[in-house]
């Protein structure tokens, strides 16, 4: 993060004010103030680690993944009990993304479900959409298979299995 001296002074003052307003986190803010004042470039990087940027294309792709899961869940609910028995219902749960390698995607899913109120039927589970394993490539393969299905919102058990196994 490149900052002018004036920007560093403003940020330093903000950290000082935060340390006064939030005594429980005062040490954290004082440390951040010191990093900014002294210009420690390595540590300054940790100050902006949560600043991300997801392009419009990436946002739409994530929404497509979530919509695919919504369609699979709705399709499952429309199946007969006999056909439902052929589907592993656990695989209908949208797991999210890996926080270690796909943090921006996890945060976007959390934003969509919490702040925007979308997909309330998705179970956040204990991990709140942290799948704990990379999922982006898997979802892309699944999405390709789903898009090739003639009736995307009325899938049969065979089509669900094909999507799961993509």
UniProtKB/Swiss-Prot annotation:
It comes from the Bacteria. InterPro entries: UPF0304_YfbU, YfbU_alpha-helical_sf, YfbU_helix-hairpin_sf. This is UPF0304 protein VFMJ11_1926. Belongs to the UPF0304 family. It holds the Pfam family YfbU. SUPFAM superfamilies: YfbU-like (SSF116960). The lineage of its organism: Bacteria, Pseudomonadati, Pseudomonadota, Gammaproteobacteria, Vibrionales.
